[in-house]
Amino acid sequence: MTVTVVYDNSEATELCAAQHLYLKPIAKLMINVLLPECIEPVRPFSNWEVLDQLKSLICPDQFTTVRLSKSTKDFIRFEGEAETRSLVQILKAKLHGKIIKLNGLKTDLKVVATDAQGEWEHFPKEKEASVIEGAEEQDHDKGPDSIYFEGLPCKWFAPKGSSGEKPCEEILRVVFESFGKIKNVDIPMLDPYREVMTGGSFGGLNFGLQTFEAFIQYQESTDFIKAMESLRGMKLMLKGDDGKALACNIKVMFDTTKHFSEGAIQRRNQERLKLQELEEERKKEKKREEEVAERKRKDEVRKAQEKRKKARDRRRALKERDRHRQRKEKVKTKPEARQELDSSGEWEERKYLLARRRVEALRLLRVLLKKIAVWMRKEKNLKPCQTHISLLLNCLGSTQCNPQEVGVMKSEAHHTPGTALKSPEEEELNTRHLLDWEEMPSYQASTLDLSQKAEKRCYQASKSDNKQKQKGKKKTKAQLQKSSHTPGVKQMRHSARKEETGKVLSDGCDYSLVSDQNSLQSTMIADQSLAKEDHASSNESHSSRQAVINRGRKQKIYETDEFIDYLLNYYQTPEYARFCLEASHLTSTCQWQRDVYAKGDGFQIYLRKQGYHSNSLSEEESLQGIEQDEEQDWPQVYIKDPESKSQKTGKINYAKEFTKKLKNHCKDIASETDEHLSPTDGESYPVEKIHSHGVKDSQHIRKSPVSSSLRSVDVGLPLADFLEEISSDSECFSETLSMNQEEEERSMAVYNSSPEKRPLGTDKISTCKQKTKSSQQTLCSEWKHDNEGKYSKHRVRAPGKRSKSELRYSWLEEEGDSIRVDKNISKTRGKLAPKHMLDEGQYHESSSSDELESTTRKKRRLTSGMFDQNVKYRPLHMPSMPPKRARAFYLGYFSRKRQTPWKSEYNQDVRRFKRYENSEDYTLDSDNYYVSHDDNQEHIEYGSYLGDSYSSSLYFKMF
């Protein structure tokens, strides 16, 4: 209902003083405007024009509210409300019977004003008439005794101080008991089930004020009638504490639905029960849902707790396991530490024993070499070889050398090339003198003392190895890098280089014997560790340079005690075959392979044709800006030991014929030489060659090239086998020496040539194609490393630069004392083209440049690999000589660098024969012999392993 502000409350009557509720009469006026009855069309007009005319009639008075109640073709009805009833009467007088004129209308409009009546004003008259007609016997319960209120403001009937706006039945009862005693009061808004049953239509909003419905039943009908009469045409007014009053129209009617009847009450109760049951079910369902949700929540919490607990247990178990493992490791480390302490003493004793065995092996080797020298001294045709045996003994047994002889040799080493060498008779006398001196008792005593000193030095060196290993490794790398970038000694002219032939660029003593053109230039390096006490005076001048060279040196694998232990305790003489021949053509891809086997007194030869493809790496030469690559494919010769029996026996005749031809050819070579290098006996071998890489002292000893003895007819294979057994050229090298990754660079054998004479062309050094037979590698310079798979590439170093570690060796001999083979002098000398045999049948070839024949002296560095070390060497350049007097015999040492994987199955006892394209040229190649024949020159290379601490490689070149 409409809530209005009351300005004049003079006509208000009190309803309930406690709630400040009053009843104010409704002052309404009904205004009817009659429309004219005419057929003629009139101008249309609006209701607002008529209302404006009415307001002008009552001016200055005003209506509180005016609204259009009804509009027809006959009249227009307006309902107006004023403040008081007296004012309504005044307005009625002003409006009743008045005429309104509208513009455009020919006729006038008449106004009729009357008082407004309630909707149920006729109700008491009907009831009174019925009573009069004799309806007194009718039950009053059947009559309307309940009042229905609509539009009561909730806030006005709510308890004071409450935040809610819900009405209270007690307040409603108190307010309306002023008319009589109330029997029942019902507010449907307060019943939640009723709100569900009726759809929530028990209240509403009246201009922002929430209202409600109520049913009131009086006990007495008279009270009911009194209340109805009092509430007819009234408004409910609330007077505030501040004096302001608000009036609200309420709707008051008698109850026509019999709301308080028993049937209605019973229906409402049943519905309430149903609603209660539904509500209970809803509550239970809600409770169940809550319980399920709670259970799920608890389960999740429990799972999370279990998960956290498992994680904690797992972490605890891991920590416990780690602690247990640490305790175990601690328990293990303690016995290991004690065991290491216990075994350290035993290892020191073992090192001392190994050092002593090494010295004893050297003694035994010297004794054997002396016996060979004595035998060769008896042979008349082996006088030239006696000199080399003596030199070998001097190098090997430098600790026993006569200081006078050492001084003599050192003085001879600095002679000019014009100085002639001693005659063969003088050399023989020197050799005998040396042998006689070695057989003296004083020599034995000094040998014993020196051996004991050497043992102590080896023992002390082995103890300091482990401490200096890490320092030495870093220092060696720095020194190698420094030495690799440091320019070498500049190339001197022939006259100046003659004066420098006696200089020492490596460890040990340097003995140089220089003669004229047909001279022998030799350099011998003695073992420094065994000779430095007895030769302190002779080596004093070279100590400073040796200290510089030895600085940063890394210990080699064959110097270690582990290698010596393997060599002395586990190494056994190889039992595999030793003879195998193979021939190949230089240009053809298909080759005839010839295998020669020793069988009894003869040979057995197999011939078979095979396809071959070589993979080679050529040397790079840089001489005067010209680069030339040459490749030579030499036949491969394998010689097997008589121990390996042949499976085929059908070609013995051819083997015997080949053997006879070889013997005759060796005899021809011996007959052409002046000094009969090889024995006249055909069964003997011309030269013995073993590439040696001996074990050095662990502190500062370097390997020294030394000469070896010739093999005689009487000594034969057993002596060579025995030497191989005690030598260091064994399978141990292939298995242990590959562990050494870094060694100082060395360049050896630099020979000068005179500018005014034409330099000799370097000879062809033949290398063999390797044929794997029963998984055996048969080339002496061929090794396999476990980790590397590339082949080394040899480069010629630019002239004028030389590494500090280069060694010069120039042995020059008189024409009468040299070995000479004059064949077809008119032909051009061959160029040096060494082919280094690679593993698995692959070649490593090198080529030389034609600029070697120019007047400028060229230096050449051939980098190759041995035991995976960086070692530099130079080709041999002999002084130029006339062809007729071209008899030169020189000793050189080639250190070959290998980067290819070396195989451990190194065949030490293989004998190899090589045949060149020329049918008259043969090469007897083995681990003990290496002979290369050419039209103008021949090569004889021989060497021998001379113990654990010595190494040598002798190379003879005949022109």
From Swiss-Prot:
GO annotations of cellular component type: nuclear speck; spliceosomal complex
Keywords of the record: Coiled coil, mRNA processing, mRNA splicing, Nucleus, Phosphoprotein, RNA-binding, Spliceosome
Region (Disordered): 284-342, 454-501, 528-548, 750-771, 827-864
Coiled-coil ranges (or none): 261-334
Listed InterPro entries: AK17A/B (IPR056852), Nucleotide-bd_a/b_plait_sf (IPR012677), RBD_domain_sf (IPR035979), RRM_dom (IPR000504)
GO BP annotations, alphabetical order: mRNA processing; RNA splicing
Stretches assigned to the RRM domain: 145-253
Composition-biased stretches (Basic residues): 305-331
Biased composition (Basic and acidic residues): 284-304, 332-342, 454-468
Bias kind Polar residues: ranges: 538-547
SUPFAM superfamilies according to UniProt: RNA-binding domain, RBD (SSF54928)
Pfam families: RBD_AKAP-17A
GO molecular function, one term: RNA binding
Subunit structure and binding partners: Monomer. Component of the spliceosome.
Miscellaneous information on this protein: 'Talia' means 'waistline' in Polish.
The protein's role, per its UniProt record: Splice factor regulating alternative splice site selection for certain mRNA precursors.
UniProt protein name: A-kinase anchor protein 17B
Organism: Mus musculus (Mouse)
